[in-house]
Amino acid sequence: MFKYIGDIVKGTGTQLRSLVMVFSHGFRKRDTLQYPEEPVYLPPRYRGRIVLTRDPDGEERCVACNLCAVACPVGCISLQKAETEDGRWYPEFFRINFSRCIFCGLCEEACPTTAIQLTPDFEMAEFKRQDLVYEKEDLLISGPGKNPDYNFYRVAGMAIAGKPKGSAQNEAEPINVKSLLP
């Protein structure tokens, strides 16, 4: 009999504790945001829409090395390499299918020229799936992105047609590695 009364008291206490918890949550600040009216907080390293950037001279940074397409685990990046008269590579077309992209950031890490970068933009909703396939013109932005002073062709020491290595601006003379051997 005492066990039965003890179970009733224990059950009533559990119910009262649950009611207090529910009512206390009713007076707290709400976690739900009214999205279009209230801006959403994004962490500093949020990975959103992918963009292609330009170097400080205004030319596109992408050298069509295809490393981003190889690093992509879902294969949503495709591009075709072309070459200018001075020997510089560029993508003839660059295409990203955002309906397949998982925004993992591996393409950004693989890019040697920092041409492909992820931005905090996440508003990419479309009614048709075909509109989620972005071409180079849709991805290319006018600015340098996260690395404003980086220029791959100056840093890498790439030979420019008509000029020997080491003769470009801000470029050191090449080192003869064989002379360093013992």
Swiss-Prot record:
Broadest EC class assigned to this enzyme: translocase
Catalysed reaction equations from the record: a quinone + NADH + 5 H(+)(in) = a quinol + NAD(+) + 4 H(+)(out)
Membrane topology: Peripheral membrane protein
EC number: 7.1.1.-
Superkingdom, natural source: Bacteria
GO process terms (BP): aerobic respiration
Record's subcellular location: Cell inner membrane
A single Gene Ontology CC term: plasma membrane
Cofactor: how bound: Binds 2 [4Fe-4S] clusters per subunit.
InterPro entries with a match to the protein in the record: 4Fe4S_Fe-S-bd, 4Fe4S_Fe_S_CS, NADH_quinone_OxRdtase_chainI
Sample GO molecular function, one term: quinone binding
Leader sequence segment: none
Residues that coordinate or bind [4Fe-4S] cluster 1: C62, C65, C68, C111
Cofactor(s), by name: [4Fe-4S] cluster
Binding site for [4Fe-4S] cluster 2: C72, C101, C104, C107
Alphabetic keyword roster: 4Fe-4S, Cell inner membrane, Cell membrane, Iron, Iron-sulfur, Membrane, Metal-binding, NAD, Quinone, Repeat, Translocase, Ubiquinone
Span of domain 4Fe-4S ferredoxin-type: 52-82, 92-121
Free-text function comment from the UniProt entry: NDH-1 shuttles electrons from NADH, via FMN and iron-sulfur (Fe-S) centers, to quinones in the respiratory chain. The immediate electron acceptor for the enzyme in this species is believed to be ubiquinone. Couples the redox reaction to proton translocation (for every two electrons transferred, four hydrogen ions are translocated across the cytoplasmic membrane), and thus conserves the redox energy in a proton gradient.
UniProt subunit comment: NDH-1 is composed of 13 different subunits. Subunits NuoA, H, J, K, L, M, N constitute the membrane sector of the complex.
Similarity comment: Belongs to the complex I 23 kDa subunit family.
Name recorded for this polypeptide: NADH-quinone oxidoreductase subunit I
Organism this protein belongs to: Pseudomonas entomophila (strain L48)
Organismal lineage: Bacteria, Pseudomonadati, Pseudomonadota, Gammaproteobacteria, Pseudomonadales
